[in-house]
């Protein structure tokens, strides 16, 4: 008969011998700006590295969920169309929930492997594994492009007759006082009237 301590030691010895970190898992905040009719995710490479996932796999997921085309340019991602930080963040979080986080222990210490042509999420922290199912687009919360009181990073596309900088986000035309064409500015939306939005630099 083994005593409790010896049984515990034997059980611990059979646990996966992997290095994990107790540090809080933090997804980098997407750094976005608009360039013409495209949206640039400037720190895409950093996000993929943090998630420990193949950039091509992450990019394929994002373009599918956003319903657009895109490409990777160095360490940044370029999406056709205008998207907000909220839209990108929601989809990255959905990707993490499905393709990164272990459903048993809640840790990000996982790998994607194929077993008999089935994509499986294998956890190196607790040893659990589960098949990955394609997430439906309806599971991702899509928010309004901009909201009053929200802050956004924009690229100024033009200057209006009154000297205000003008940027486009989705269907909205955003006016930014004191901004010049080509500037990348962070603004707070003060008021929205129809498809027009009035902001101030922050």
UniProtKB/Swiss-Prot annotation:
<comment type="subunit">
    <text>Heterotrimer composed of an alpha, a beta and a gamma chain.</text>
</comment>
<comment type="function">
    <text>eIF-2 functions in the early steps of protein synthesis by forming a ternary complex with GTP and initiator tRNA.</text>
</comment>
<dbReference type="Pfam" id="PF01873">
    <property type="entry name" value="eIF-5_eIF-2B"/>
</dbReference>
<dbReference type="InterPro" id="IPR004458">
    <property type="entry name" value="TIF2_bsu_arc"/>
</dbReference>
<protein>
    <recommendedName>
        <fullName>Translation initiation factor 2 subunit beta</fullName>
    </recommendedName>
</protein>
<feature type="domain" description="TRAM">
    <location>
        <begin position="145"/>
        <end position="202"/>
    </location>
</feature>
<dbReference type="Pfam" id="PF01938">
    <property type="entry name" value="TRAM"/>
</dbReference>
<dbReference type="InterPro" id="IPR016190">
    <property type="entry name" value="Transl_init_fac_IF2/IF5_Zn-bd"/>
</dbReference>
<dbReference type="GO" id="GO:0003743">
    <property type="term" value="F:translation initiation factor activity"/>
</dbReference>
<dbReference type="InterPro" id="IPR002792">
    <property type="entry name" value="TRAM_dom"/>
</dbReference>
<dbReference type="InterPro" id="IPR045196">
    <property type="entry name" value="IF2/IF5"/>
</dbReference>
<keyword id="KW-0648">Protein biosynthesis</keyword>
<dbReference type="InterPro" id="IPR012340">
    <property type="entry name" value="NA-bd_OB-fold"/>
</dbReference>
<keyword id="KW-0396">Initiation factor</keyword>
<dbReference type="InterPro" id="IPR016189">
    <property type="entry name" value="Transl_init_fac_IF2/IF5_N"/>
</dbReference>
<comment type="similarity">
    <text>Belongs to the eIF-2-beta/eIF-5 family.</text>
</comment>
<dbReference type="InterPro" id="IPR002735">
    <property type="entry name" value="Transl_init_fac_IF2/IF5_dom"/>
</dbReference>
């Amino acid at each position: 008969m083994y005593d409790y301590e010896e049984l515990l030691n034997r059980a611990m010895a059979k646990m996966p011998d992997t290095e994990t970190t107790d540090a809080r898992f933090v997804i980098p905040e997407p750094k976005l700006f608009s360039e013409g009719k495209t949206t640039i995710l400037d720190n895409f490479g950093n996000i993929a590295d943090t998630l420990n996932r193949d950039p091509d796999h992450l990019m394929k997921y994002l373009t599918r969920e956003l319903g657009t085309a895109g490409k990777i340019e160095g360490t940044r991602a370029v999406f056709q169309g205008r998207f907000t930080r909220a839209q990108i963040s929601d989809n990255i979080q959905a990707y993490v929930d499905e393709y990164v986080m272990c459903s048993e222990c809640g840790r990000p210490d996982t790998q994607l492997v194929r077993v008999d042509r089935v994509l499986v999420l294998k956890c190196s922290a607790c040893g659990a594994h589960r098949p990955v199912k394609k997430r439906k687009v309806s599971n991702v919360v899509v928010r309004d492009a901009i909201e009053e009181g929200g802050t956004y990073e924009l690229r100024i596309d033009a200057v209006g007759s009154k000297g205000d900088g003008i940027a486009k986000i989705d269907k909205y035309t955003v006016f930014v006082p004191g901004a010049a064409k080509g500037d990348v500015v962070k603004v707070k939306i003060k008021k929205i009237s129809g498809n027009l939005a009035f902001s101030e630099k922050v």
